[in-house]
């Protein structure tokens, strides 16, 4: 059994964390994210080209101011018609560059979301039951929906800002150094304190981002619970309680979000203030006679304009730290899930099973030390029907999960037709076991697709129709608007409980497996439907090994043998008549059933 997946914690270490030099875990996460971008190198190249064009126009805007100012001072009329044309062309070229950069960044971003989301979903399909036992459904869905979107901030949105504004800063700084390198060196003086501010903010962003992820998982979890249990909520008047619970977790999310806003609201102005101080010193020095006498008015205006144009990209580069840390936190969460051990398949055999089952000294202990089965022994002949009865928690469902290898034994051996169950491939094993659960699972698709589900999709319409007839579902299906092609809605809630159960039985009948497991398959049916379904089940159970988990003992009197479970062991075993003569556990339960 795999190690249970641990949900994200809002706590984070205050150890080494830097926006400039990423610590090893953060660097590893970022490099892993960037690896997803390799197939889109051509789009990134076009993005760089576009933003390089955009950065180049920033220089020419500053340079154009020099030419215009000098032309005005010199009263040069020869270029009067040229400047408007240059202005229009500059902004046209700038627009082309921005389009290339923005479009191809978005293309990479949306494809990354698609690939990550599909990879996470496919990973969920391969994870063992222990993962789902350890994690609420809302937390899992939050990773698939919220965290994947957040990851794009680290890999594409941040990349866009770094390329666009980074190239702009490089271009402008190059222009400033070329124009007057002595004055420009003053701007580098404020670089260390700016990097220190970004480093401090980086630590806080990462911590708060993990907190937001945790609270979003709580929001999704509560929402899923209320939606799935809306009938209980309404029937027991739980609206106020659920509203309060949702409000509390939403407020936690709000507080975490506002803390990020506060951090960003302090971080950005602080960086801008340092830039303003540097700019003020540059202007003060530039206006000194020793400096200004050596340059023209146009050169002065051009230099100051270029220095002023630095403000916006520097601010954006400061803000990108927030996006980057948020994305890295989400990336750590997603990669932790993707690195989870998958359901182990040790099987190498794909036999055609007859249905002989042997359980030899089976024990099953859950991670919380709960003992579900202890030294459990049972031999089931091929074609035999064995009913499992007992109080809730006696180990009936655990036994079924062991047979499908949804769970693994703690000790002991299970064999099918004399072969250890671990030696049979999971796909082969599960293809030869049909199940009808008490909790019916239907999907938001057509009646036909719900019966011919998964590996049964190749079944013909005639086979599906026959299975429905055997389950006494054909008549109500034909009364639906589009017959077998009718949509049944989410979880089949448009159908009655009996109708939903009959579709589930039809699915099991269509599978035609040598081993059949019925978890109180008639529990949701009315008396008349139960009579016909029981007859259909009697037919399908013939010549098949059948395990029946029974809650109403009147439904399993005809079983070949009845095993009474208590405390994870068999305390009584025999036919209905034999067990009644013992006047033990079974007889007492049977009497209570009638009462």
From Swiss-Prot:
Predominant place of localization: membrane
Positions that bind ATP: 390-397
Compositionally biased residues, Low complexity: 9-19
One Pfam family linked to the record: ABC_membrane
CDD domains cross-referenced by the UniProt entry: ABC_6TM_MsbA_like (cd18552)
Annotated ABC transmembrane type-1 domain residues: 45-326
UniProt-annotated location(s): Cell inner membrane
UniProt topology in membrane: Multi-pass membrane protein
GO cellular component: plasma membrane
Molecular-function GO terms, alphabetical: ABC-type oligopeptide transporter activity; ATP binding; ATP hydrolysis activity; ATPase-coupled lipid transmembrane transporter activity
Catalytic activity reported: ATP + H2O + lipid A-core oligosaccharideSide 1 = ADP + phosphate + lipid A-core oligosaccharideSide 2
Residue runs in coiled coils: none
Alphabetical list of SMART domains matching this protein: AAA
InterPro entries: AAA+_ATPase, ABC1_TM_dom, ABC1_TM_sf, ABC_transporter-like_ATP-bd, ABC_transporter-like_CS, ABC_transpr_lipidA, P-loop_NTPase, Type_1_exporter
EC number: 7.5.2.6
Transmembrane spans: 41-61, 81-101, 169-189, 266-286
Enzyme category, top tier: translocase
Keywords on record: ATP-binding, Cell inner membrane, Cell membrane, Lipid transport, Membrane, Nucleotide-binding, Translocase, Transmembrane, Transmembrane helix, Transport
Domain of life: Bacteria
Subunit structure: Homodimer.
Family indicated by similarity: Belongs to the ABC transporter superfamily. Lipid exporter (TC 3.A.1.106) family.
Domain notes: In MsbA the ATP-binding domain (NBD) and the transmembrane domain (TMD) are fused.
Biological role: Involved in lipopolysaccharide (LPS) biosynthesis. Translocates lipid A-core from the inner to the outer leaflet of the inner membrane. Transmembrane domains (TMD) form a pore in the inner membrane and the ATP-binding domain (NBD) is responsible for energy generation.
Protein name: ATP-dependent lipid A-core flippase
Gene name linked to the record: msbA
